[in-house]
């Protein structure tokens, strides 16, 4: 969960004691709960308790300081994130107090830095393992672009462990959900990355034999 850059107020530190909410209609927890409930969002209490209400599928907003956050759906610690990015929000100061707010910011700062470091390290390792497996550059780009989405992040360690069978299986699973519109594009074999292929295929004729045994073993219904 990250704030939208254009909603960060650089002068907010000059208004430390201003607590008038920007969205008075969402001042109560019930009102914020309702904003999530009508859109069938699960486990929304943690967001409403952090002073946030539903704006759109890609965005939630603080009723007090007005800061907007994106990529929020899988966030486990919205209160900490809100405190970290909007430390002078009147709601956060009233809820946590100055000392509690400072402790939470320091705690999340360590977590945030570690998370960024681990993500970068995982990407580097994953790229190297895919390269060692002999996958083409377009294939590696496809995996790296999609594998770090929250629902799939848990599978990364299997790729890092050089599990070629799993990588093919995982890629086929991703392909079924992330099929790109290739009407005006030339697409290439996902193994060699050299030979052009038809828009509804994944491998060239030379690589089909190499890849068929993997898909046959995994009982996959992927068109070669």
Swiss-Prot record:
BIR repeats lie at residues 29-92. SUPFAM superfamilies: Inhibitor of apoptosis (IAP) repeat. The keyword Zinc applies. It holds the Pfam family BIR. The keyword Oxidoreductase does not apply. Keywords: Activation of host NF-kappa-B by virus, Host cytoplasm, Host-virus interaction, Inhibition of host caspases by virus, Late protein, Metal-binding, Modulation of host cell apoptosis by virus, Virion, Zinc. GO terms for cellular component: host cell cytoplasm; virion component. It comes from the Viruses. Zn(2+) binds at residues 62, 65, 82, 89. InterPro entries: ASFV_p27_C, BIR_rpt. GO terms for molecular function: metal ion binding. It is found in: Host cytoplasm; Virion. Induction: Expressed in the late phase of the viral replicative cycle. GO terms for biological process: symbiont-mediated activation of host NF-kappaB cascade; symbiont-mediated suppression of host apoptosis. Belongs to the asfivirus IAP family. Interacts with subunit p17 of host CASP3. Prevents apoptosis of host cell by inhibiting caspase-3/CASP3 activation to promote the viral replication. Also induces the activation of host NF-kappaB. This is Inhibitor of apoptosis protein. It comes from African swine fever virus (isolate Tick/South Africa/Wildebeeslaagte M1/1996) (ASFV). The lineage of its organism: Viruses, Varidnaviria, Bamfordvirae, Nucleocytoviricota, Pokkesviricetes.
């Amino acid at each position: 969960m990250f704030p939208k850059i254009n909603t960060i107020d650089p002068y907010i530190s000059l208004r430390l004691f201003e607590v008038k909410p920007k969205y008075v209609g969402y001042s109560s927890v019930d009102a914020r709960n309702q904003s999530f409930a009508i859109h069938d969002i699960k486990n929304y209490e943690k967001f409403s308790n952090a002073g946030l209400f539903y704006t759109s599928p890609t965005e939630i907003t603080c009723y007090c300081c007005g800061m907007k956050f994106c990529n929020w759906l899988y966030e486990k610690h919205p209160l900490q994130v809100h405190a970290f990015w909007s430390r002078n929000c009147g709601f956060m100061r009233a809820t946590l107090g100055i000392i509690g707010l400072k402790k939470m910011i320091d705690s999340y700062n360590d977590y945030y830095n570690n998370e960024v470091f681990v993500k970068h390290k995982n990407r580097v390792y994953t790229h190297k393992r895919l390269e060692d497996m002999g996958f083409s550059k377009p294939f590696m780009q496809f995996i790296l672009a999609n594998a770090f989405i929250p629902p799939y992040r848990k599978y990364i360690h299997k790729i890092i462990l050089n599990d070629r069978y799993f990588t093919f299986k995982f890629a086929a699973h991703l392909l079924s959900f992330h099929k790109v519109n290739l009407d005006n594009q030339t697409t290439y074999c996902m193994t060699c990355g050299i030979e052009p292929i038809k828009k509804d295929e994944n491998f060239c004729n030379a690589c089909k034999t190499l890849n068929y045994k993997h898909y046959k073993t995994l009982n996959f219904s992927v068109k070669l």
